[in-house]
Amino acid sequence: MNGRIFRDFSAKTIGGVVAEIREKMQSLTKYTYEIILVNDCSPDDTFDVIRKLALEDPKITAIDFVRNFGQHSALMAGLRQSAGDIVICLDDDGQTPADEADKLLEALENGADVAYARYAHKKHSLFRNFGSYVNEKMAEVMLDKPKTLYVSSYFATKRYIVDDMIRYENSYPYVIGLVLRATKNIVNVDINHRNREVGESGYTLKKLLGLWMNGFTSFSVKPLRIATIFGVISALAGFIYGIVIIIQHFVLPDRVMGFASLAAILVFFGGMIMIMLGLIGEYVGRIYISMNRSPQYIIKQIVKKEDVSEQNSDKQT
């Protein structure tokens, strides 16, 4: 059985993380492994560092994107490059302990298709924790995620799940949605959460909103159904209010109908209509982009020691 681990990194933390992965995987003697490092166009010299690591170790593959495509596109690139029976995905901030990967592997050996790390005490910022909470709740509503299941960026999955995930070619990948679509045999494993080694989380409110929109419009039609329900409720409310106005006109003929209430109603229903049109437009726009085959990511280069060795050998001959 092969254990495969990949992640994207910061140049300041990569050396220690790779060393930790090596040490842990070498202690698990029944596994062979490879490390796939995906550079999602980091602003520092990350790719120079991981390129050097790849040239020194045949077990390491370095992937460099042309531009920033986002975490989920980077994960898809790593999944497609992997070849093992098991794939373990880690985040890039040093907070996910690679030395506890054996806990995830054990869960898969016990029959699970996917094992997600669950943190008893998360050491993210208050904003990141709030974003994670909202993401959990929205996934429960939109993607039918079980309430007892905690999803995180640190997880292990079996090969047949990976094979199903990488068949997804639409422009907006959402890994959680792909996992939930593929299997319900998912478990949580308690893992310690570390303090962030360098910098701050790259997730801003804009990125979180974009991630939620990607996931829920790509893997669920529930937003459209919710919009339909709101439309029906609004129409009924408007109809009832119209009846009330007619009754008041006959019961209280001297009463002057207020312009303010009419304006408020128009603004409310106008806002509802614009929201629904925007939601429909989002779906139509994504269909259009997918039909144009907009790529999930563009790889600038892939570096492997064996490939470089073969090229040098060809030049010598």
List each language-model region with its residue ranges.
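A conserved acidic beta->alpha catalytic loop
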Residues: 39-48, 94-95
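Short aromatic/hydrophobic "clamp" motif used to bind/position activated sugar donors
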Residues: 87
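Cell-envelope/extracellular polymer assembly enzymes that use nucleotide-activated donors
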Residues: 1-2, 34
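Hydrophobic helical membrane-anchoring modules
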Residues: 12, 174-317
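Short, well-formed alpha-helical segments that are part of the catalytic scaffolds
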Residues: 9-26
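Acidic helix N-cap motif at the loop->helix transition within catalytic regions
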Residues: 12-15, 44-53
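Short beta-strand/loop segment that forms part of the nucleotide-sugar
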Residues: 18, 29-41, 63-64
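Acceptor/aglycone-binding surface of glycosyltransferases and processive sugar-polymer synthases
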Residues: 52, 63-67, 71-81, 95-173, ...
